[in-house]
Every structure is written in C-alpha cells, then in structure tokens.
Amino acid sequence: MVQKESQATLEERESELSSNPAASAGASLEPPAAPAPGEDNPAGAGGAAVAGAAGGARRFLCGVVEGFYGRPWVMEQRKELFRRLQKWELNTYLYAPKDDYKHRMFWREMYSVEEAEQLMTLISAAREYEIEFIYAISPGLDITFSNPKEVSTLKRKLDQVSQFGCRSFALLFDDIDHNMCAADKEVFSSFAHAQVSITNEIYQYLGEPETFLFCPTEYCGTFCYPNVSQSPYLRTVGEKLLPGIEVLWTGPKVVSKEIPVESIEEVSKIIKRAPVIWDNIHANDYDQKRLFLGPYKGRSTELIPRLKGVLTNPNCEFEANYVAIHTLATWYKSNMNGVRKDVVMTDSEDSTVSIQIKLENEGSDEDIETDVLYSPQMALKLALTEWLQEFGVPHQYSSRQVAHSGAKASVVDGTPLVAAPSLNATTVVTTVYQEPIMSQGAALSGEPTTLTKEEEKKQPDEEPMDMVVEKQEETDHKNDNQILSEIVEAKMAEELKPMDTDKESIAESKSPEMSMQEDCISDIAPMQTDEQTNKEQFVPGPNEKPLYTAEPVTLEDLQLLADLFYLPYEHGPKGAQMLREFQWLRANSSVVSVNCKGKDSEKIEEWRSRAAKFEEMCGLVMGMFTRLSNCANRTILYDMYSYVWDIKSIMSMVKSFVQWLGCRSHSSAQFLIGDQEPWAFRGGLAGEFQRLLPIDGANDLFFQPPPLTPTSKVYTIRPYFPKDEASVYKICREMYDDGVGLPFQSQPDLIGDKLVGGLLSLSLDYCFVLEDEDGICGYALGTVDVTPFIKKCKISWIPFMQEKYTKPNGDKELSEAEKIMLSFHEEQEVLPETFLANFPSLIKMDIHKKVTDPSVAKSMMACLLSSLKANGSRGAFCEVRPDDKRILEFYSKLGCFEIAKMEGFPKDVVILGRSL
C-alpha cells in the first residue's frame, strides 16, 4: 500500500508539472543564481515537506551519520543509537550506509512493503526520541542528470520515503567520477552545474524542507582543484545552490587530524554558507585492522558558531562508538550557544577550566590543550567512566556477529553479505539470562538480580559517584555553566569513586527493549528441575581447585583499551609509551649481550629495568583481554573481540622478543632504523609493533583470526631455561608416541635426546617454550647456523650420547628405539652448501595436542624466526619423517614448503624450508 500511494502521488505531481511549461523537460536545465539569503524561495509541489523555519534560527545539527562502507547497522542498534543521542543531548541521525544497495548502487529501486515498514518504524523511533531523521540518497554513480526520466525516478524514490514520515533529506555526490556522459555535456557547462541543478529541483519539489543537505564531490580541501579558494566547482556550488540547502564538508582531508577555524572560514566564503561537518575522525572502514576509541579531538569549540552542524561518521562496529559519540556530545555541550573564546577569556585568563586542563595534561604525552572550554582527555575519562557500566549488563542481539581479524567477516549466521537487503531484517533484542561468571566485585555493573541475604552481605559497600555519571534527569534542567563547573569540580578529585549500582539507576540507563525483555524473564528462563533445586551448591575441598570467578572490567582496562585504539593520527599515551619503550629496548639490546665488550653496569641495569616495566605493560594488555573476554555484555565483546585479540597476540610476541633480547649471547644490528609517524602505516598500533619485529613481512604468521567463540585463555611464550628440559622432553615424547604409537618406556629420554637435546644444550639463545596455567605445553627451538652447530654436536653432544646409549648389534632386526640409538654411532650426513646458503637455520617445533588454538603455533613460529632473522638468517629448514603426516601438516600450515630433492639430501627425511 505504501508503494502504491507514493506512486499515485507522483503521478498527480507529474501531471501538474506537465501542464506547467516552465517545469517541462524543454525548459533550461542550467540552474539560476541562488537568491539572496533573505529572499523568499518559491514553494515546490511536494506536499510531504515541512515548512522552513522562516524568521527563526535553525538549530545546530549535531549527531551521527551512518555513512561508512561495510555491513550496515541493524534496526535495533539504530534505535539504541537514538536513545543514546537523546540522553547525550544530540539531535540528528543521517541515514547513508554505503552498502545499503538501495541507497547508492541501486538507488532507483523502490523499497518493498517489508522494507517500508522497517523504515517507517525507524523514522517513528527517531521521532519518539526527538532525533531528526535525515534520509540520504546517492545517485551520482550512474545518474544521467539531463534525462527527465532519471529525475522523475529520483523524485519517485524520495516521494516514497516522504510517505514513510521522513521530512529531512540529503543528496550525496561523494566518491564518484567527475566526468559527465555525452548527453549531460550537451546540457550542462560543468559537473557542478549538473549536480546543483538536480539538487535545487529536488529541494523545491519536496517543498524546501527545513533540513536538506548536499554533499559535493569536492568535499574536502585535498579534493579541491586547484585549491579551496580557487575551486571552480565550489564557486558554482556557492553561487547556484539555493541558500536553504546546507553543504557537507569533511575538513582539510577526508580524515582530518585537525579542522582549523581558518579552513572553515575559507570554505564558507566560497560556498557562501557555513558548512555542516561530516567528520571521519572515528571512521575505520578504510583500514580493517583499526578501531578508534579516542576522544573527539582537533576541533576547537570556536568552530561551533562558524558551522551549521557536525555529524560524526564513526566505526563500523556499533558498540565501539560509545566514546566517539559521547565525547562529541561533551564537545558540543561545552559551547552549545556558540560562545567565542575571546568572550570566555575576558573575565579571567586563569579560569578554573584552564587550570584544570593544565592539571589534567601534566605528565601527559599529549600536547597541552589550548581550548579553554573542552579538554579531550577529560571528555574521554567521562565517557569511559559511563561506558564501564555497560560491560556488566548481560545483553546480546539475537543474530550474533563476530568479525574475524583482518578482513571483515563476509558471512554472518550463514548468510552472505552479497546483495544483502537494503534494510536489515528485523532483529529482536534478547537478554542473556544466565548467571554471568563474575567475581563479587563485578556487582558494580551487573544485572540487577535478586540476591539472598548472605550474598548481599558479601557485596562490597559502594558509594554513588558524584560526577556527571549520575542520573541524567539531574542535568536536564541545568545551564551550561553549571554543567561545566560540576565537570571541573568532579575531575579535580584524586580518584573516581565506585559507580552507583542502585537498581533504579541501572534500569534508567537501559533501553526500552531491554527493560521489556527483562519483564518477560520468567517466560524464557530455562526450566529448573526439582533435582537441580534440591542439589546443594558445590563447595571445593581444601585440596581442590577453587571455583572460577571472572574479574570485572575496570576503568583502567578501558583507559588502556582506548590508548591502544586511539585516533587515526596518534596513539594514546600508554600505547605511544609502549611503542617508544620497545623501540628503545630493541635499539639498545646490545648492552645486555653476553659477548658485549666493555660492559656498563648502569646501562645494563637501565635496560633490564625498562624491560621489566615493558613486560609489566604487556601483562596489563593480557589482563585487559581476559577481563573483557569474560564480560557479561557479549554485544560489546563481539564488536571488539577481533581487535583486542589482534593486539593481545602481537603484544605476546613482542613481550617474548624482549625477553629473548635480554638473555641472548650475541649482539646484532639487524634491526630497522628510523622511526615513522604512527599514522604513516596501516594497521594501527598492532601494525606498528609488527613492523618493529624482524619478520614484519611474514603476514601469514601475523594473520590470526579469533576463535568463533570468544575465549579468555591466554598463552605465554618465553625463552627456554635449563629447568624446562624435563617438560620439553615430556612433550617431545608424548607427541612422538602419538604420531607413531611406539612408546619408549625403557628409554624415556631417547626421543628427546634425538630430536631436541642438542638444540637445548648448544643453541640456548634460540629456544622458546609455550606455557598455560598448567605449565609448558609447547616448544620452538632453532639454531641460526646449522654448520657450526653440527660441528659442536660432534665435539660434545654426540660423544655424550654414544656413552649414554650403547651401540646395538646391527646383525639382528632393530626396533624403533634401537634404530635411534644406532644413529648416534653413525656418521651424520652434511647438507649441501648450496642449500645451506639460502636456508642456514635449523628449526624444530611442536605443541601438545591439548592446545586447540591455531594462532599459538603462528605466534611461536614468529618469535623463533624473529630471533633467527635478527641475527642474520636468510631462511630456516626442518627435517621430518615422511610417514609423520601430523607434523608435515603442522609445518605446512606455518608457511613451510617442501624443498625439492637434491644431491646430498638424506634419503629417509623430508626437508621443509621457509625463507625469511
């Protein structure tokens, strides 16, 4: 019905236009000059439009644009967004997802009845939360501007959307080719004239809506030719575009580090109006390894009186945008009335706010903020403090989505993303009603559940936090100065107090959907049998393991998380500190080398002290990963897990590498020199650490997709110590027995002596072990140059083995164990020099079968190869029995390939190699 009604309306309008010669296709399509800002504009035919606010000032548009490339948000996420926007006093949502195919690629297609119902529901929800819903359409990929049928198709599409209740619109011509087709070139003098013509026509057709946005093709300073002030394109837009139409602008660049006041004044002059900023500071669709959890930054509050609005285009992952939107709201509210800085500073240059900003930035790696009204670091801390409450509230969407590391997940719940519906199918929000694995301290953010008296006594006493994290209603009626003063006073406190866990305040922070689901808890809770009810709670004995309880996410965890995933052009203070420390430890590692001449005890002590602090910082990352993985709110976890998994994995490698640097015998100068700016490379902080490792190009080892089911298990890779020998031998024996089924009960050390003993004794510098909570469960061993290693073996290791194992009688048929014993008494074959020139290093790796995480083996191989390449190796090889299919497959998955047989190769082994 919705479609039919909109089509009928369009037919009536087209009949009116056909009777009007001025509006016919034969009329000139060149747009007239835009009337003066105060001049009346003729009303269009669109009956669905809302009258403009004549004579009244338009409100400042501030909110979110869903304009990224990637899987669009689902409807329930958008409704949750509206709730948050209202709570934080923002007012606008621009619907423009690039991968909604009816928004961009197939813009001509009308919405189906089902899609129409969803859009109407969404528009209604926005109205309920007092959020202005702006529908954007991007016809620029293939529209013929001079074709009346194309223009009519666009009108028909927007007519349909207006029937849904939408009153605000946007035409986007971003990221398209500048060249016009031959038909358009005959009618329009330039690309800008064509765009302005159709924009003006649509604007008037819809009745000149109060909010109508236009995104130019030259939407940032770097896209303007030859520059902003001399751009013919922007000049045409400024002169011809009707004054009631606002222009979107991203700043000096597509992703602008800063948006100076001068740059806005420059573009405003040529487009003859104040722009609306489409801000990509938190957008991550251009780099699938990066996430941005830092504050809104680099935009002075002096911009507010010079703009018509700011819409942030944030991360693709919805739940990762809490900080981005919250800090934008803080920025906006800090100068909501558009007060100029010179007015603020007239009373006192040393105002309370500026003093607090100086205090907040003391000892910080960041530049001291000069904006007297807004401090990014203060805004970040406020956002993280409020966000912390969300982690303890059990919640997840019914269609769970876990994006893999690297490329975004292309299939969710078995449904390919190709030709996905333009409006996501209705997604029902469900709340997980199972008791989360939480420690007693987790109560600060947990689901309000009924506790027994005994449990209530165990809960720690908590105070409400006397900051802006209090009930939202208390701030609704306060003026800006009161709010600002309260923020400053609260931030002067030395420590943040625990958050209020009062059930009423928790309930107020929840979405209506969550509250509704909680009302129905009895309907969906799993059935409890009499047997379960009568069963006493298990209490472990004195010699048994205690019950596992997960620690809750802390504010320090979120601060560290934000620092690791900060902003496009900079890392957070802790992330930058870790990067600098690793660079210093790597560059100065020669001072702790055993063979270092002229040792300086002070330098050695400094290196070891800084290494210990760095390892401690790496440990904080592991702890943050564990607590986040165990958090009750799985919705947040699923959106961020792949990113946290990546940083955890790379920091595990880096920590192991630093430990190796501190205990090796040889110094090396194989490291890269010179530091680049953090934003010069892709991949964020994890990418920066990867590039500082010697094997930075081994992308297959660094590509470690997270498990389908999030896990908090953490493995440790560290250098081998002599005390670990028995554990390594045990793993070697168990895995060998598992492969051939021949236990060596009478000689338990035999297989270990054969496969790993020489490396453990003579090549200690290149040996690593894998540990979990139960002990050692894997090893990675190597030697940088096998030729001198074999010579050492002949001198010391082989004679010791010959003495330990008597040479068996070769006249009889030998057992597997006897064959290994005999090998110690036979001449060792030497590999060809032509082969060793390219693959000089010998490696041996194995992991216990209980380890099921495939990323662990990649991390171990990365650590081993990093140590070898750091000391000049060009390649590594390993020797495998032809019948050992398990280990052959194991090495193949780690990037090793079979070397073609050549003269001098042993006949009873397969040689696999890997270039470094």
UniProtKB/Swiss-Prot annotation:
The record marks D413, G414 as: Cleavage. One of its GO terms (biological process) is N-acetylglucosamine metabolic process. Optimum pH is 5.7-7. Proteolytically cleaved by caspase-3 during apoptosis. The fragments interact with each other; cleavage does not decrease enzyme activity. InterPro entries: Acyl_CoA_acyltransferase (IPR016181), Glycoside_hydrolase_SF (IPR017853), Glycosyl_Hydrolase_84 (IPR051822), O-GlcNAcase_cat (IPR011496). Changing D175N: Nearly abolishes enzyme activity. Changing W679N: Nearly abolishes enzyme activity. Ubiquitous. Shows highest expression in the brain, placenta and pancreas. A protein binds at G67, K98, D174, D175, Y219, D285, N313. The active site is at D175 (proton donor). Signal peptide: none annotated. This is Protein O-GlcNAcase. It comes from Homo sapiens. The gene is OGA.
